[in-house]
Amino acid sequence: MTTLMVQGTTSDAGKSTLVTALCRWATRQGVAVVPFKPQNMALNSAVTADGGEIGRAQAVQAQAAFLEPHTDMNPVLLKPNSDTGAQVIIHGRAVTSMNAVAYHDYKAIAMQAVLASHERLSAAYPLVMVEGAGSPAEINLRAGDIANMGFAEAVDCPVLLIADINRGGVFAHLVGTLELLSPSEQARIKGFIINRFRGDIALLQPGLDWLEQRTGKPVVGVLPYVMDLHLEAEDGIDQRQTDKAEQVLKVVVPVLPRISNHTDFDPLRLHPQVDLQFIGPGQAIPPADLIILPGSKSVRSDLAYLRANGWESAIRRHLRYGGKLLGICGGLQMLGEQVHDPLGLEGAPGSSAGLGLLAFETQLEAEKQLRNVRGRLALEDAEVSGYEIHAGVTTGAALEKAAVHLDDGRCDGAQSLDGQIFGTYLHGLFESPAASAALLRWAGLYDVQEVDYHGLRERDIERLADLVEKHLDTGLLRELCGISPCSS
């Protein structure tokens, strides 16, 4: 069994993407590889085959390894529900919410879960490909660390350090990070990878030579900047757009402070006939064909934020003029009359008035609903697959006109009688080509082009593996991964 870890000098250095690439590259060598991230902090999560939730980046990495996502791939998931606190998910199940100070004291327990998952994966797969979190050189977080060097030291694994040259200061990032590590941690760094390089590599070569002489460690390779890579973002909302056709549907998404699973919108961002616009604080909602209320980790506070920005009146005006409104998960709950949180799961206990657009109420309960589902939209009877991640139980007369009929016999969501409003608990709606096309037609787009989002993601994973083979020292990678030359 071999474990190789990728750590980064900063957040968004390219760790998730590199681990995805290495997982697919390893499978090309005939090696059964499994992705692993000890601790992840993200509001984008995926439902696993064993009925839990993990970070979506690990689900993409599982696809790269031709595996079904499993909770052992991300044993500790932190989902922020305030500026200072987060829901703590261990082995796919929410166990508690706590602030940062309390979680610091909880890390020893979390580390037990991390090591147990790693032990199980190590027993089942010859290669475990690990992604760190943030930077290993965060001085204030090093005590009790379970996400970076604390984990690497515990399991005695080598580390590759990646840095993003596109943001500038790449040599300072690499050397500075190395200098802030202990001698034993420095020894674990087996090489550097520079990410997102544009230009002539010959102009960079003197810097690479200096880096190797200064540190005594090799540069494993320089990965180019890839303009049209469309894997799901782990944290920030990706607002890049593809080139659009002449016939375009205008879709607007208000960005809420606790927005969750914003990867729901990636297929729309890539659709050639959709103009997707995210609206931030202080911005007015522009004229649109479709407004989508996204998922939320804190529905009541996000409702207050929506109102404070004047978006409620904009939504009502949008409906008056015939526009369509879609609510997903927390967005569905906002469409109703009341949201009750008697246990204080998402803040102070209490109730908040919803938008009152559909006749139902939602009560938040401690047990979260986690499942992958299949079914058919009420719109056009279109086939859909997706996943549920929610703590709310919704009841009321509006549910009699369901939005989705699930294969397990349940009905999901609701529609307005006039057909302008559609709400569902299902994430991933737009990843199903037929369901996406039906929703876009409902919103006013005709002659819809169906887009194979899963196919696009698979293509990009293959491209990443190609970049590894072309730009990295695969001989050193084989050595670090314990892959013999005859494995492929």
From Swiss-Prot:
Keyword Membrane: no
Active-site residues from the entry: 329 (nucleophile), 427
The keyword Protein biosynthesis is annotated on this UniProt entry: no
GO BP field: cobalamin biosynthetic process
Domain (GATase cobBQ-type) ranges: 248-435
Function: Catalyzes amidations at positions B, D, E, and G on adenosylcobyrinic A,C-diamide. NH(2) groups are provided by glutamine, and one molecule of ATP is hydrogenolyzed for each amidation.
The protein's name: Cobyric acid synthase
Organism: Pseudomonas fluorescens (strain Pf0-1)
Gene: cobQ
